[in-house]
Amino acid sequence: MSFNHKTIEELHDLLVAKEISATELTQKTLEDIKSREEAVGSFITVSEEAALKQAAAIDAKGIDADNLMSGIPLAVKDNISTKGILTTAASKMLYNYEPIFDATSVANAYAKDMIVIGKTNMDEFAMGGSTETSYFKKTKNAWDHTKVPGGSSGGSATAVASGQVRLSLGSDTGGSIRQPAAFNGVVGLKPTYGTVSRYGLIAFGSSLDQIGPFAPTVKENAQLLNVIASSDVKDATSAPVRIADYTSKIGRDIKGMKIALPKEYLGEGIDPEIKETVLAAAKQFEALGATVEEVSLPHSKYGVAVYYIIASSEASSNLQRFDGIRYGFRADDAKNLDEIYVNTRSQGFGDEVKRRIMLGTFSLSSGYYDAYFKKAGQVRTLIIQDFDKVFADYDLILGPTTPTVAFGLDTLNHDPVAMYLADLLTIPVNLAGLPGISIPAGFVDGLPVGLQLIGPKYAEETIYQAAAAFEAVTDYHKQQPIIFGGDK
């Protein structure tokens, strides 16, 4: 018997009633991972021994009836530090790295007696939109194994979508939770910048990175955010604002809610069938009592260019620490210190990572800083101001998560610009530090379409309220790929 169709609340009831044990649930989860892993390739590391040991300890002390997550397995993206469990960032550079500490998000999960079942595949150092730049393997879409799962958190998305696990953690720098959530038909949230501690997250773009949850449903997503969100003295960017319960507005109606639909989000480059799906969703929100009106975010068209200058510049600084001296991969053909640095970084980093390091180094270099990095920061401010103007009059922004459904494996990985444009609709949210969610909203050619809801800072409860209202009157979240037992 598999438990992957049961919600977290249903699993909790079974655990409390002792109809199953944490060990049995962990064993079944490990079986689900193994039976599906060859097809989708979600995991880099499955921590079977550690997970079973932790489950046994939880069983020994007993399930806490007041702790919803007690004994629940969790998959963690492989750029989030896990003490004693390989944390590679999907890079040759860290192929053998075992952290000596847990990320705060992981420590928070452990504090709630969640069981880390394994580490999921991703684009190397979270740089990519297809999970094809991983040093270890290419993850495949849960709905069609000839398509990409999205990225960079592709493994975390497919692990949930394929029924390997119920919950997972990812990170989002320019869309890396929302895009794979959309491509795989699951719920993925990028919280407000600072809501979840970045301590223990292997840094890519420090002003953009944010850890967030994946789940099959809106409520389960919010329940996981309840676990990982916290202020943290170990993270200087951690926000002091903490919502007591992110599920508090789920189930409330949305009558009177004002939702903005930016015309730029339905313009050039957006697949016509995606546009139709979003417009149908807008009508559904109106039927639920919300007002949906067209607005403009005029500077969003510069988002991709701004992002790749800022993110690459921050990455070029953050990745300087990987030099072959202290930990990780070291080139064995070096004859002196300079060659250790050069050869290690040349051999240890993949092409996409090296491309972004070079772009960032150029943008920060003397003579080009003002023309690129400084100007990108100024345009970033304009993008933030666009959002501020809209949120002065509206509660949420609605739009597609991605311009297309999942594209084929090996179709865009040799065309960086085309790959970058796939994040056209998600990047502005990171630049502004806002919360955004992707929820299932339909299908095009048998592939899931994601609907994005964006809120002002710290409006996660309102986002969850609207997302849950839409979910309650649609069945897209209930449809599952064949690998999960569905009929698609």
Swiss-Prot record:
Enzyme Commission code: 6.3.5.7
Reaction(s) catalysed by this chain's protein: L-glutamyl-tRNA(Gln) + L-glutamine + ATP + H2O = L-glutaminyl-tRNA(Gln) + L-glutamate + ADP + phosphate + H(+)
GO MF assignments: ATP binding; glutaminyl-tRNA synthase (glutamine-hydrolyzing) activity
Any one Gene Ontology cellular component term annotated for this protein: glutamyl-tRNA(Gln) amidotransferase complex
Gene3D superfamilies: Amidase signature (AS) domain (3.90.1300.10)
Keyword Metal-binding (UniProt): no
Catalytic residue list: 77 (charge relay system), 152 (charge relay system), 176 (acyl-ester intermediate)
EC class name: ligase
InterPro entries attached to this UniProt entry: Amidase (IPR000120), Amidase_CS (IPR020556), Amidase_dom (IPR023631), AS_sf (IPR036928), GatA (IPR004412)
Superkingdom of this protein's organism: Bacteria
GO biological process: translation
Swiss-Prot/TrEMBL keywords: ATP-binding, Ligase, Nucleotide-binding, Protein biosynthesis
Family note: Belongs to the amidase family. GatA subfamily.
Entry function: Allows the formation of correctly charged Gln-tRNA(Gln) through the transamidation of misacylated Glu-tRNA(Gln) in organisms which lack glutaminyl-tRNA synthetase. The reaction takes place in the presence of glutamine and ATP through an activated gamma-phospho-Glu-tRNA(Gln).
Quaternary structure and interacting proteins, as annotated: Heterotrimer of A, B and C subunits.
Alphabetized HAMAP family for the sequence: GatA (MF_00120)
Record-given protein name: Glutamyl-tRNA(Gln) amidotransferase subunit A
Protein species of origin: Streptococcus pyogenes serotype M18 (strain MGAS8232)
